[in-house]
């Protein structure tokens, strides 16, 4: 059993403070969601992305911890609305599994959960068990990246997947012919998820290196980065160091209206050659100057 504390009417300038207090009370995980299902916006580099009204969900293993956290928060901030819900392990897992079905990207790539057989056994099948924290291909930016990889010539290419999450892009690239992929992320849980998914797909160390970004040294043929605008801009010089002239950089994770900002920011180091859009999100392709 798990105990979920739902916190509403949170002032945006108090969210960080509230999440720190929840961690001190023993929260195992904390999730921020938008009450009105608006996209997270980052209009200027370096700004903090926040929705107009945020809901905080905190997961606890013990009812006493969750109740204590609620009492502490309400005592300090009477305007907060806190509700406690009991979550059954089986129901939580079942709901997640029901939402994840096999998906096709392009003509030949399928992403399939571990608990279902691939619809086309002879296609390029990526078996994925992402857990609750990382991507499964359902988000538009991941879909854009997978579709681009599916149509690209990756044979014998070395690739960096910057911000690998579940490893979905890394593993897809290898399945599609890449010689070696460097999967990097600043989150250790992402690296563990990537390692687990690599094992499920029989990917070897000769094909995939998993590490923090600081370990990157060798130039590659392609960098793909599905992350937010601010880190994309801040990583411009780093990407340029890793890509020889003419090599490709593929970026996603940004809204359509943010695309011109990234193109302008990269102009001194990269040439913009293509753009794809999906559900209000964009994928940009550059070559290194």
Curated annotation (Swiss-Prot):
UniProt GO BP: methylation
Keyword rRNA-binding on entry: no
Disulfide feature: none
Catalyzed reactions per annotation: L-lysyl-[protein] + 3 S-adenosyl-L-methionine = N(6),N(6),N(6)-trimethyl-L-lysyl-[protein] + 3 S-adenosyl-L-homocysteine + 3 H(+)
Protein keywords: Cytoplasm, Methyltransferase, S-adenosyl-L-methionine, Transferase
Pfam families from the UniProt entry: PrmA
Similarity section: Belongs to the methyltransferase superfamily. PrmA family.
Full protein name: Ribosomal protein L11 methyltransferase
């Amino acid at each position: 059993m798990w105990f979920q504390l739902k916190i509403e009417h949170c002032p945006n300038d108090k969210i960080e403070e509230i999440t720190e207090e929840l961690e001190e009370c023993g929260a195992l995980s904390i999730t921020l969601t938008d009450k009105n299902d608006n996209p997270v916006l980052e209009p200027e580099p370096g700004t903090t992305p926040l929705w107009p009204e945020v809901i905080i969900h905190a997961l606890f293993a013990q009812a006493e911890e969750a109740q204590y956290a609620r009492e502490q928060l309400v005592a300090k901030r009477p305007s907060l609305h806190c509700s406690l819900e009991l979550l059954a392990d089986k129901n939580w897992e079942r709901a997640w599994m029901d939402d994840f079905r096999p998906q096709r990207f392009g003509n030949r790539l399928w992403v399939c959960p571990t608990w279902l057989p691939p619809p086309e056994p002879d296609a390029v099948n990526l078996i994925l068990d992402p857990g609750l924290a990382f991507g499964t291909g359902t988000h538009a930016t991941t879909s854009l990246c997978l579709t681009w990889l599916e149509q690209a010539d990756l044979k014998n290419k070395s690739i960096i997947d910057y911000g690998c999450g579940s490893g979905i892009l890394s593993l897809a690239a290898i399945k599609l012919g890449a010689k070696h992929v460097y999967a990097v992320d600043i989150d250790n849980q992402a690296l563990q998820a990537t390692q687990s998914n690599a094992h499920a797909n029989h990917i070897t160390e000769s094909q995939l290196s998993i590490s923090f970004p600081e370990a990157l040294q060798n130039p590659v043929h392609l960098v793909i980065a599905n992350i937010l605008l601010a880190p994309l801009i801040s990583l411009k010089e780093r990407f340029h160091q890793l890509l020889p002239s003419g090599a490709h950089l593929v970026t996603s994770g940004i809204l359509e209206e943010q695309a011109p900002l990234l193109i302008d920011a990269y102009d001194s180091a990269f040439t913009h050659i293509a753009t794809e859009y999906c559900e209000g999100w964009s994928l940009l392709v550059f070559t290194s100057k």
